Design a protein with these regions (language model features):
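Generic recognition of flexible, low-complexity loop/linker segments
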Residues: 26-27, 168-172, 208-212, 255-257, ...
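General "foldedness" signal
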Residues: 53-57, 63, 153, 196-200, ...
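Long, K/E/R/D-enriched contiguous segments that form extended
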Residues: 217-266
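Short secondary-structure junctions and interdomain/linker hinges
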Residues: 15-18, 60, 207, 211, ...
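N-terminal mature-domain "stem" immediately C-terminal to a signal peptide or N-terminal signal-anchor/transmembrane
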Residues: 1-6
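Single conserved position on a long alpha-helix in the C-terminal lobe of the eukaryotic protein kinase
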Residues: 9-125, 261-266
Length: 266
């Protein structure tokens, strides 16, 4: 409609017309249990933000209906999205399942707005370590959220002591003049998993760039890794299930010799 077009033009000129602060963190999160996705924003101008919600609701074919419950304002965007906010922050919560009741979504969003530190992600030791190293974009993932069937599949190829569900995966992206720096890693609070991860990482060494002369100058992607095949084979054989499968395959192919022959850049 004309109102949304007018707001869109204003936002193009000045993004703060949404009433949202772009100087503070913008946070996306996913709840694996409730199957919901959240967006957390800092409010800079509550009146402008309410105007934005009004236009957003009208575009979705709904009347603006902002209700106040104690110190929290609640607005239903559509059947699968809700916004709760106060004079400081706004939380958009989206249901990934279409059969989710809006009352349940409202209940979850209100609980998140009211929860204390002890019930939040800040109480997770694994996240605390991650939050100490912030860049422009920061991504944190708990492997415990991976479906159990997928975890079992991955586990069948990894050392027995490596508990995937205890691993946290991280990515940091930093935008600098003339370049983008991406750092990724993983860590665990579980002692046995830590040791297994260190052992697994020892399989990989620094690349020597031995074969770069053979790569054409117009290449758009180069991926290289330095592997110790003998170490890799020994680690894989620590998993009894994998060792049994290797035994069956080895009747046709000498995998120990094949994998063990890898020693250097690929």
């Amino acid at each position: 409609g004309p109102e949304s077009k007018e707001l869109f033009e204003k936002v193009l000129q000045n993004p703060t017309e949404l009433g949202i602060s772009l100087k503070n963190d913008i946070i996306f999160f996913s709840d694996a249990i409730e199957n919901e996705i959240g967006l957390l924003l800092k409010i800079d101008d509550q009146q402008k933000f309410e105007t934005f919600l009004s236009i957003l609701s009208s575009e979705k074919g709904k009347d603006t209906n902002i209700k106040r419950e104690n110190d929290i304002f609640i607005s239903e965007i559509n059947a699968n999205a809700i916004c709760t906010f106060d004079d400081n922050k706004a939380l958009f919560l989206f249901a990934l399942q279409y059969n989710t009741e809006i009352t349940e979504l409202k209940k979850d969003a209100t609980a998140l707005m009211n929860q204390n530190k002890e019930k939040s992600l800040l109480s997770n030791n694994g996240f605390s370590k991650f939050s100490q190293s912030n860049k422009d974009v920061n991504i944190w993932m708990s492997m415990a959220a991976i479906p159990s069937t997928t975890l079992k599949l991955y586990s069948s190829f990894l050392p027995t002591d490596l508990k995937i569900s205890s691993i946290y995966s991280t990515t940091h992206i930093d935008f600098q003049r003339g370049k983008i720096i991406i750092e990724s890693g993983s860590y665990s609070d579980d002692t046995k998993t830590k040791k297994a991860l260190d052992n697994l990482i020892s399989v990989v060494g620094k690349t020597s760039n031995s074969f770069l002369k053979q790569i054409p100058e117009n290449s758009w992607l180069v991926w290289s890794v330095n592997l110790n095949g003998e170490k890799l084979y020994n680690i894989l054989m620590e998993n009894s299930k994998f060792a049994a499968e290797i035994g069956n395959v080895s009747k046709e192919i000498n995998l120990q010799q094949l994998i063990g022959s890898i020693d250097g850049d690929l």
